[in-house]
């Protein structure tokens, strides 16, 4: 009997429901009235869940429509829809606020299952974390997405309206010239008018999105404060229970409201930034086409990811996998082309599974394409593929890329001496610092400006500059009698002011006191300084092995004993020395110290490095002597140094200075001021001598502050050398 009544009721109501759906205007009116009813009428929890679900679904639907339309005006109803959806979401905020304040004391489940689920999921037992997550979501929506969307719509509306007269004149010109008829002209004018109306409406509608984001913040505060007061003073809830209950509900309500708001704001930006597209290609296809248009960009991304995968501490597998994937896609695209790649995949699937995946009309018989080139054997194809992959994956350790006008500098047949200069650099680095830098790969790069060059370390640009191959660089070192004419520039290695002068003015420049440098020397000097700057990066495990093998020829016992020490520890000590410009020529002393100390300190690199530095006192003192044979230095006053010693904090075997902002600023200013006085006297580098316990921590602090000061300790000075104190740094901490 009940089934019969249900069938009868359904039979009577379905025609009404059908007419309601067919009458679109009536459906919209009912929807708007329902929004107003939501604001006024209290709703049971299951109805509220239903309405919140509709809100999320609508936002997802809108952003998908925004992605699939060909041009913005295809979604001309979007500004009005934006207003209605915003009103609907604010009505839901009112309804959920009412429910939270009136039913929240009964527990989260009495309000809404969706709100409770979102709240408990995000909070995860920690209300502070939940509040932070919600705050981040609100700030991202308000400050990033909403502000960006609003600005885009404003600018797009302004440009669309400014372009109206020109577009109208273009339509009239086409009509007058007979390129289009009256019907086509009317169609274009209508589309132009629709575009102007759309962007004008979007300019105003975007303000709804921003207002909605601000309103949600205020509503959230009301829910928390109001709910807490209601729970404590009206429902006699404890402070903790009231706070936990209403925090869960408020955060859940905020998330349920903010997620659709964020999606709608994103959809607004997508629609506003869409350009008129080709009808033959949708947005997603065009996006993929443009992202993969240049296979070399995929190669660069993949190579960089593989490089990052070699850095300790980073996720090796993830970076290597994604990097290899990018390189593989780039290789496939460069070899087959995007269309050819898809065609090949389509043919393979068709043959393998008997599927017809072609979208184009075709005959029942498929005629094979006649080969236009000689068929390659599988071995040849495999060899070419391996060579292509090897070429893509190979990263030169040190590379010098030249613009096409600079190629002559490296061509000995044309009188270029750049290669000879580079060989001289390798000898000089080996003599001064004690390691052999790798060969520099010199190649041309047509993508560079003609007179520019780049120096790369492991595929990453570490320096670049510009030289004029037919001119000379004239540098004013402070002894110029009279300035000469030239093209102003910056010397790339040291950043000093200089001039590019013609060869005919070279002798005159020398007479007037300028230092003259030829283009090859400019590049070579820049390369040399960069090698010194990044010297620690050249100490690979292979280089450590080579250093030990050379030392073993004369001192086999110490090298054999050092095999008990991990190669990584030896390498880290060498890198730490080079990082602070300490030569590693005296490998015998370095290795003896490491083998003596390492077992006692469990191979701790920090302690080993400081002990090695103390044993290298003669090397360090000699490295920083002035031309007159004296080590000229600065020191701290007793009070200042004692203050810094008191601020040292130990972190395992390392130490750091624990200074507040004011103390750190005073330290930086005090050291910088005295260092500048030393530099003005023509003395470089600036040496600062401190207590051994303070040296490493202060050196790290100076490096972070980008103050070019060499920090040495008393233990690192050769007592038999000559010294000259240049001043004392007094800091009133």
From Swiss-Prot:
Cross-referenced Pfam families: FHIPEP (PF00771)
GO biological process, one term: protein secretion
Region annotation (Disordered) ranges: 360-381
Bilayer topology annotation: Multi-pass membrane protein
Domain of life: Bacteria
Compartment list: Cell membrane
Xref: InterPro entries: FHIPEP_1, FHIPEP_3, FHIPEP_4, FHIPEP_CS, FlhA, T3SS_FHIPEP
TM annotation in the entry: 28-48, 49-69, 125-145, 213-233, 246-266, 291-311, 313-333
Key word Transcription regulation present: no
Primary site of residence: membrane
This protein's UniProt keywords: Bacterial flagellum biogenesis, Bacterial flagellum protein export, Cell membrane, Membrane, Protein transport, Transmembrane, Transmembrane helix, Transport
GO CC annotation terms, alphabetical: plasma membrane
Record family assignment: Belongs to the FHIPEP (flagella/HR/invasion proteins export pore) family.
Purpose: Involved in the export of flagellum proteins.
UniProt protein name: Flagellar biosynthesis protein FlhA
Lineage, uppermost ranks: Bacteria, Pseudomonadati, Campylobacterota, Epsilonproteobacteria, Campylobacterales
